[in-house]
Amino acid sequence: METATRTTYNGWANRETWNVSLWINNDWVAYEQARGFMVDYKGRTPFQDFVDAYGYISTPDGVLYNDPKLSKRELNSMMRELL
């Protein structure tokens, strides 16, 4: 009998991606900034462009917004779903 390997964290690619999404969606200031940013956004990489525009460095609990483990694909999708 094979054992399934857990490959996600709460439905996200990993803990870091989940954590960043959690903070953007649950911190009122970050959420409002992200929604406002997306209103007129026409680019292809909304997550990175948002982080760069607002100078985000890390979540309050220490996950870096430029952590190489982040799934940019998932975070870009999350940003597009804010509207």
Regions found by a protein language model. Give the residues of each.
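Acidic interaction surfaces
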Residues: 1-83
